[in-house]
Amino acid sequence: MLGKVRPDRKGLRRAYQGLVLVSVLALAPMTWAWLSSTGHRAMAEGAGWLGRVPETQAALVLGAGVYGTRPTPMLARRLDIATDLYRAGKVRALLLSGDNSREEYDEPTTMRDYLRAKGVPDAAMVLDYAGFDTWDSCVRARTVFGAERVTVVTQEFHIPRAVTLCRTAGLETFGVGDDSSRRWASTTYAYAARELLATAKAFADAKLLHSEPVYPGPREVSLTRVLEQPPA
């Protein structure tokens, strides 16, 4: 008669400890982003949301996809928020950072054209054609365009990572987010789920590898010239 097989308690304990370690390592970047951005973010909702946003030099609007010459709905919301910030005197410039790695795909120009149609003057807009990801956009805002204080504009699920990366890049940063789940729930939840991996990569880029942007330079004076102009 075969005896009962007893579980290997030591093996089970090690497996449990390994699972705990993996869970901690997986959640550590999210915790880093959340804690580092606490007190430096607000949602663009409610009648008084602009009153919760400090004045900075520029709104750093991060690209979020375009359909030909039209911004995606999420990007359009970011641009609407940036327009509100500009008209309220919360920022003096709009730094439009996005992907133009292919001739037929041009996020910054599409962003500019959308804002131009809303009445934002060209003189207030600066285009960064090499904002290929959030880290590149933040680093280039400081090292290429010379920004010191920015209000980064994106969706709520992205705000902790965006604010934390810009602060790590050396920018004094406040973030304003759009609660996209009210309009596009399924898309928002899908993007939010991807934040776990995206934040892990961001942590590696910013804290471990100290990655350089794809295009680290040269220095541009376009933002400086906008800020040197007298307020409108």
Predicted regions mapped to residue ranges:
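N-terminal membrane-anchoring alpha-helices
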Residues: M1-V53, V214-V221
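A general structural signal for short secondary-structure boundary/capping elements
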Residues: R102-E107, F174, L196-F203, E220-R225
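Short linear elements at protein peripheries
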Residues: H210-A232
